[in-house]
Structure formats: C-alpha cells, structure tokens
C-alpha cells in the first residue's frame, strides 16, 4: 500500500511538472515581448 502511494505521488508530481513547464513554454512563445527565450 505504501509503495502504491509512492508511485501515485511520483506520477502526479511528474505530470504536474510537465504540464506547468509546457504551459510556461507555450505562454512565453505566445508573448512577443519575450525574445530572450529563443
């Protein structure tokens, strides 16, 4: 049961991190004022 909880938490954390990184990257690319990310 403890192992299952660890796996679930790891998966959720990874998913949230990827979603946040993707959202920030897309938001920065849509913003014409951010030329330093190229």
Swiss-Prot record:
Cell compartments where the protein resides: Plastid, Chloroplast thylakoid membrane
List the GO cellular component terms. chloroplast thylakoid membrane; photosystem II reaction center
Residue intervals passing through the bilayer: 6-25
Task: Note whether Membrane occurs among the keywords.
Answer: yes
Membrane-topology annotation of the record: Single-pass membrane protein
Chief place where the protein resides: plastid
Among Pfam families, the record links this protein to: PsbI
Q: Which domain of life is it from?
A: Eukaryota
Keywords, ordered alphabetically: Chloroplast, Membrane, Photosynthesis, Photosystem II, Plastid, Reaction center, Thylakoid, Transmembrane, Transmembrane helix
Set out the biological process GO terms recorded for this chain's protein.
photosynthesis
InterPro entries assigned to the protein according to its UniProt record, in alphabetical order: PSII_PsbI, PSII_PsbI_sf
Q: Which family does it belong to?
A: Belongs to the PsbI family.
Please explain the role this protein plays, according to its UniProt record. Answer: One of the components of the core complex of photosystem II (PSII), required for its stability and/or assembly. PSII is a light-driven water:plastoquinone oxidoreductase that uses light energy to abstract electrons from H(2)O, generating O(2) and a proton gradient subsequently used for ATP formation. It consists of a core antenna complex that captures photons, and an electron transfer chain that converts photonic excitation into a charge separation.
Subunit structure, as described in the record: PSII is composed of 1 copy each of membrane proteins PsbA, PsbB, PsbC, PsbD, PsbE, PsbF, PsbH, PsbI, PsbJ, PsbK, PsbL, PsbM, PsbT, PsbX, PsbY, PsbZ, Psb30/Ycf12, at least 3 peripheral proteins of the oxygen-evolving complex and a large number of cofactors. It forms dimeric complexes.
| UniProt name for this protein | Photosystem II reaction center protein I
The protein's organism comes out as Rhodomonas salina
Q: What lineage, starting at the top, does this entry show?
A: Eukaryota, Cryptophyceae, Pyrenomonadales, Pyrenomonadaceae, Rhodomonas
The encoding gene: psbI
């Amino acid at each position: 049961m403890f192992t299952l909880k660890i796996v679930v938490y790891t998966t959720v954390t990874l998913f949230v991190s990827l979603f946040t990184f993707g959202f920030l990257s897309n938001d920065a690319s849509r913003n014409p004022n951010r030329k330093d990310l190229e």
